[in-house]
A protein has these predicted regions:
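Conserved small-domain helix->loop->beta segment predominantly found in fold-type I
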Residues: 203-254
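Conserved PLP-enzyme active-site core in the AAT-like
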Residues: 5-214, 219
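Conserved PLP-binding active-site segment in aminotransferase class I/II-type PLP enzymes
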Residues: 1-3
Length: 254
């Protein structure tokens, strides 16, 4: 899966996959760093359950690697990454973020739902094997495709991390039904075609909206002027793919 050797795909949802990663890799007294545009339920989990269990957190600017570097300290045991960010779709310099985490000895976990393993390879970001430690994915979205299945995955190349994740997965009692598995497996062969079709349609609509007088800004990583566009181009240029998600900012008068 996504070029990784070890995978846990029996997650009942994408959020369950996120929770499994945080619960497996953090303990009381640790600190986790999260981008300020992270998936909302991940923030809620961090501010709620994790905080109650003595795990602190800081939010960092995903477009400023120096800000992330300044926040890493001796208590930092996990850095969450998102490319692109949730809702506002800023695209970070993911390569430099991962280089920083590895240089500082901090585990980094990517929410790779947006890229779906197609826009870029999270385990080979630079063509030379630089990759995240763990990639989580809401299979509910693009892999399922039908909107009728909840499922998630956690993927790693690290055997020690895989064991931690596997034990947490077992202790939390995560499981999924065989019918849901069948539905996702049936949809996987068409995933590349569907993802590309979503991308084409979204870009066409985004460009149309960009010319509307009501629209102040279109937030789409593949469009020039969108925050982090250069980072998207550097990372996803070989595939020229982007998900079918974008946001718009309306002028106040509208």
């Amino acid at each position: 899966v996504f070029g990784a050797f070890l995978a846990l795909t029996q997650m009942p949802s994408g959020l369950a996959a996120v929770a499994c990663a945080s619960l497996a890799l953090l303990k009381s007294g640790d600190e986790v760093l999260i981008p300020d545009n992270a998936y909302g339920p991940n923030k809620a989990l961090t501010e709620g359950e994790l905080a109650a269990w003595g795990i602190t957190h800081q939010y960092y600017d995903p477009l400023d690697v120096a800000d992330l570097a300044a926040r890493i300290n001796e208590r930092t045991h996990l850095v969450w990454l998102e490319a692109a960010g949730s809702i506002t779709l800023e695209f970070p310099d993911l390569i430099e973020q991962v280089r920083l985490c590895r240089a500082r000895g901090v585990t980094c976990v990517l929410d790779n739902t947006w890229g779906a393993g197609l826009a870029f390879n999270p385990f080979d970001l630079d063509g030379q094997g630089l990759g995240v430690h763990v990639s989580v994915h809401a299979l509910t979205k693009y892999p399922s495709g039908g909107g009728d299945v909840l499922m998630g995955s956690v993927v790693t190349r690290d055997a020690a991390l895989h064991l931690k994740l596997k034990l947490t997965h077992m202790r939390m009692g995560y499981g999924i039904g065989v019918n849901d598995v069948e539905a996702v497996l049936r949809s996987l062969p068409s995933l590349p075609l569907r993802y590309a079709a979503h991308d084409r349609a979204a870009r066409e609509l985004a460009r149309w909206l960009a010319d509307r007088e009501e629209v102040a800004q279109v937030l789409h990583p593949a469009l020039e002027g969108s925050p982090g566009h250069a980072h998207w181009k550097a990372l996803c240029g070989p595939t020229d793919l982007a998900a079918g998600l974008f946001s718009i900012v309306l002028h106040e008068r509208h």
